Amino acid sequence: VMVCVWMLAILWKGRPEPWRVWSLALWMILLLDPLSVLRAGFWLSFAAVALILLLTAGRSGRRSRRQRLLTVQFGLVFGLTPLLWVWFQQISLSAPIANLLAIPWVGFLVVPLLLAGILCLPFSSLLSDWLLGLSADLLSILWWLLEQLAVLPVNLWQSPAVSGIWMLLFALGVVGALLPRALSLMPVSLLLMSAVFRLEPERPDSGELWFSLLDVGQGLAVVVETRHHVLVYDAGPAFRSGFNTGEAVIAPFLVQRGYRHVDRMVISHSDNDHIGGAEAVFERLDVLAIQSGEPGAIGWARATRCRSGHQWIWDGVHFEYLAPFDREEGNNSSCVLRVEAADGRVLLLPGDIERRIEQQLVRQRYPQLAADILVAPHHGSRTSSIAEFVEAVGPDYVLFPVGYRNRFGFPRPEVVERYRAIGASMLDSAESGAIQLRVEAGKPLQVLAYRQRSKRYWKAER
């Protein structure tokens, strides 16, 4: 759209004023597609063009072309930092080098060869094939070089999300630093930017825990946070299409919360809807310990088996495995994790255990089953949540990790009725999105459901 507006302006007025063209293109996009403001591409595209105009306006002076090119490239990376922070919580530190390499490579080598190959096509297919093949080889070399940059250990800078007002102050600082020197507000800009970097992510106090059931469709992914530690219980599904909930949901959530590593990942068992996203989490964050009910089946050498009775304490919060008792397979091998805050409130994560293990828990672990928060066993399947288990746990809140209109019909009506009979409040991720519960000393349980907190008409398409 911006190119079309620019060409029309040239035809109409000859030499259009750049900012007017930019403004007109912005107005046209918003007129044609108002919801484009919800997409990162809209903000990044218009911000990049605005930065180029700002960085090149009245700055030619005595600078050489090389100096102006460097100014624009590094200015773009610096200027787009606020938007990259807001949308992705990460910034590529190698982007200026990649752009300095790719732009002349493509502009002076690849594109001319492509055009020459196309022009030669009617006259000599042999020469055309050679030119087009050469351009393809040059693109392959460029791609290889960019891949080497991408795997550098210092390639990405990741940062937690910050509130809107702080990000606005940071953006103002960036703009002030990029203004022409005569108008520069560098001291104020540096002060604004440094203030944002000193912010610490919000964390629970010692003895408290924050529990997040992430919306990964028909699967399970839970994050448990204490004062100085974080545990991930299951990692959602991955699909043949390439979509991976670890990459799309879990890792971004952890990065947004300011974590650079996971203290412990628990993979309840080896089904895809519980393990599929784990590899993607490993790629983004360091995972210090891995435990599973089926360590051999998940295929990671450093994974150890979760066992009934194993317990530990993080920041005044007590963790204990209630099952598996023996070497089980499939759903019944699931790690059943009990988490107790300092004030005695309990979270129970049973994975996909079924009737037999529930009966065994009722017989052998009855006193420890009582919980305030329960993630329903096996997503609310009729093979789980037997009456004796439901009564033994007696939860105030039951959460069903299910996909919208899933093919299994979870949660099953008879299971829902059992929990309703004991007066439990029920939430499911299909209707509520991500669900967070905060167990904080001296406060009632705080329940935060994403869909209720973020009501927008364009998200109601169901």
Regions found by a protein language model. Give the residues of each.
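Divalent metal-coordination and catalytic microenvironments
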Residues: G41, L80, L101, L138, ...
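Alpha-helical transmembrane segments of multi-pass integral membrane proteins
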Residues: A50-V154, D396-P401
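Active-site HxH/HxHxD metal-binding segment of metal-dependent hydrolases
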Residues: S270-R307
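Core dinuclear metal-dependent hydrolase active-site scaffold
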Residues: L8-L11, W27-L38, E147-R264, G296-I373, ...
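Metallo-beta-lactamase
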Residues: V262-D273, L374-H378
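Hydrophobic alpha-helical transmembrane segments in multi-pass membrane proteins
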Residues: V1-P96, S159-S206, E294, S384-E388, ...
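Short internal beta-strands
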Residues: V266, L288-E294, Y397-V402
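Cap/insert and terminal regions of metallo-dependent hydrolase folds
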Residues: Q360-A434
